[in-house]
Structures are given as C-alpha cells and as structure tokens.
C-alpha cells in the first residue's frame, strides 16, 4: 500500500526488501572488484619475478630451477584467484540483474 507521501511505492515491504538486497549485492560486488584490482596488481608483480626466475633457471643450477617452479606456482595461484573472483562477480551481477527486473513498477 502506498503511503500519502510515497508516490513510488517504497513503503511496500517487498520493495524495501528488494532494495536492501540490491544494496548488499552492490556492496559485495564493489568489495570483490577492489580485491580483484589488488590481486591483479600482485599477479603482475609475481609475473615479473617469474620471468626473471625462468631466465635464471635456463642458465642456472638446480636451485634456480626449484625457485622457478615455486614462482610459476605462485603465478598459477594468482591466476586462479582472479578467475574465481571474476566468477563470483559475474554470479552476483546476474543475481543483481534478476532483482532489478523483479522490482514492481
């Protein structure tokens, strides 16, 4: 039921609930995007270290090859984290889009 000073129906409990969910989803998406930005920057750092380690391993001894394996594993771990974060962001964005479509007009 619309209130006297509420021409858009925001007093409806279902609309309030949808709006609260939308705000929470938007906050979660924003936090994940910040985390994604940080992880991407770290990945670039680890890729640089990995490039150096791979070059050292090509001309170095067994210790250099072990370090190259470790840095390569770090790069793969960060790439997986980025992939997971992108998947979570896409999932939450889809959920947000469905909620936006369900808002009564």
Where are the regions a protein language model picked out?
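Amphipathic alpha-helical coiled-coil segments
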Residues: 29-36, 74-99
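A short linear-motif detector with a strong N-terminal bias
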Residues: 9-10, 35-37
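Extended alpha-helical coiled-coil "stalk/arm" regions
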Residues: 36-60, 64
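Generic structural concept
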Residues: 19-22, 26, 47, 68, ...
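General structural signal for alpha-helix termini and helix-helix connectors
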Residues: 24, 31, 56-59, 77
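Short, charge-rich amphipathic alpha-helices with coiled-coil/heptad character
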Residues: 1-28, 103-105
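Short, glycine/alanine-rich amphipathic alpha-helical segment
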Residues: 59-81
């Amino acid at each position: 039921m619309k209130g006297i000073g509420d021409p858009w129906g925001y007093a409806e409990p279902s609309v309030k609930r949808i709006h609260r969910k939308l705000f929470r989803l938007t906050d979660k998406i924003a936090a994940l995007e910040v985390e994604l930005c940080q992880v991407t920057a770290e990945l670039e750092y680890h890729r640089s270290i990995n490039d150096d380690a791979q070059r050292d391993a090509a001309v170095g001894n067994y210790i250099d090859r072990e370090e190259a394996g470790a840095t390569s594993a770090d790069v793969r771990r960060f790439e997986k984290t980025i992939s997971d974060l992108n998947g979570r962001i896409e999932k939450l964005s889809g959920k947000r889009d469905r909620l936006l479509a369900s808002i009564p007009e």
